[in-house]
Amino acid sequence: MSQNSLRLVEDNSVDKTKALDAALSQIERAFGKGSIMRLGQNDQVVEIETVSTGSLSLDIALGVGGLPKGRIVEIYGPESSGKTTLALHTIAEAQKKGGICAFVDAEHALDPVYARKLGVDLENLLISQPDTGEQALEITDTLVRSGAIDVLVVDSVAALTPRAEIEGEMGDSLPGLQARLMSQALRKLTGSISRSNCMVIFINQIRMKIGVMFGSPETTTGGNALKFYASVRLDIRRIGSIKERDEVVGNQTRVKVVKNKLAPPFKQVEFDIMYGAGVSKVGELVDLGVKAGVVEKSGAWFSYNSQRLGQGRENAKQYLKDNPEVAREIETTLRQNAGLIAEQFLDDGGPEEDAAGAAEM
């Protein structure tokens, strides 16, 4: 009896294998080779290529060393919080690796002088300033489908005004028009983005929901589609000012990874954004170095390998600016221990309902 049962199982197994092979062959004949495969055989899927954000602590918090290519990323936050700065840093890092980047400036507010200061190569940056939301998303789709673009930034979702709204009159009520536009565009874009291995960064603004009694009243523009299609969502906030004597020279910034499909989410980091210079990389090296035990702090003095960097954080930052080889050495050590730093030293904001419905997956 047991032998008959065993033979039946073996026969079923052989039949299933034959049926599966026949089905796979039929799918490949109908839709082309590579339309279906075993996941482990596809090295492109297993190995995720990333681009640095320009912030060491944020790269570590993201868990994969930066923002992923072939995916949609959303950066949102209040006004003047550093959204465009972070996107421009990502473009600069991609260009350093020889990548081609594009910037769809729907807000018509890109400052080329500031972009150059952040390291962006303006001569090789493609820029478009579209008249309507449809035009912006059509340009985005065409560039992505070309397969030649590495990073494409859309600034911002809130400025993607539907054609019907532009051609209409002030005060016309057109509910849900922008949300439908974004939903349709993202359905069309997602497959092309994955195939072309192009990273598309959508910058978004925050709005207030009326009549919310409990929870955060904040939400992002453009409906819910972007929340679902984005592989990474970053909430960026200004939490303080940096002063030299009485003059404000920068912002203290907090970024929370509110959604991450590639690594554990909810990591939270803080760094400085200096006016006219962008993310303070040396400031991050000092702060992360102290947390990880790479840089020693004794009283007000900072030291590395028994070598004094300076008294006070600002003096230590200046020393690293003047001695880039020491800064590179500290950065290399920190990147080598990225997993440990992310696990032990970066704040975990927790999965509570964040601003703008951030925890939606």
Curated annotation (Swiss-Prot):
Annotated Gene Ontology cellular component terms: cytosol
Key words of the record: ATP-binding, Cytoplasm, DNA damage, DNA recombination, DNA repair, DNA-binding, Nucleotide-binding, SOS response
Chain residues that bind ATP: G77, P78, E79, S80, S81, G82, K83, T84
Expression triggers: Constitutively expressed at a high level with 2-fold further induction by mitomycin C treatment. Positively autoregulated.
Keyword hit for RNA-binding: no
Domain of life: Bacteria
Subcellular location as annotated: Cytoplasm
MF GO annotations: ATP binding; ATP hydrolysis activity; ATP-dependent DNA damage sensor activity; damaged DNA binding; single-stranded DNA binding
Gene3D superfamilies from the UniProt entry: P-loop containing nucleotide triphosphate hydrolases (3.40.50.300)
Consequence of gene disruption: Greatly increased sensitivity to MMS, decreased bacterial load in BALB/c mice, but bacteria still persist 100 days after peritoneal injection. Increased sensitivity to UV light (but considerably less than expected compared to E.coli), hypersensitivity to MMS, slightly increased sensitivity to H(2)O(2). Loss of mitomycin C-induced expression from a recA promoter. 4-fold less survival in mouse macrophages, where the bacteria has to survive an extremely hostile environment.
InterPro entries: AAA+_ATPase, DNA_recomb/repair_RecA, DNA_recomb/repair_RecA_CS, P-loop_NTPase, RecA-like_C, RecA-like_N, RecA_ATP-bd, RecA_C_sf
The keyword Cell inner membrane is annotated on this UniProt entry: no
Swiss-Prot/TrEMBL GO biological process terms: DNA recombination; DNA repair; SOS response
Functional description taken from the UniProt entry: Can catalyze the hydrolysis of ATP in the presence of single-stranded DNA, the ATP-dependent uptake of single-stranded DNA by duplex DNA, and the ATP-dependent hybridization of homologous single-stranded DNAs. Interacts with LexA causing LexA activation and leading to its autocatalytic cleavage. High basal expression of RecA may be important in slowly-dividing Brucella for intracellular survival in its hostile host. Confers methyl methanesulfonate (MMS) resistance to an E.coli recA deletion mutant. This protein is constitutively activated; its expression in an E.coli recA deletion leads to constitutive expression from a recA reporter gene. Presumably it constitutively activates LexA autocleavage, but no data was published.
Family under the similarity heading: Belongs to the RecA family.
Name assigned to this protein: Protein RecA
Gene: recA
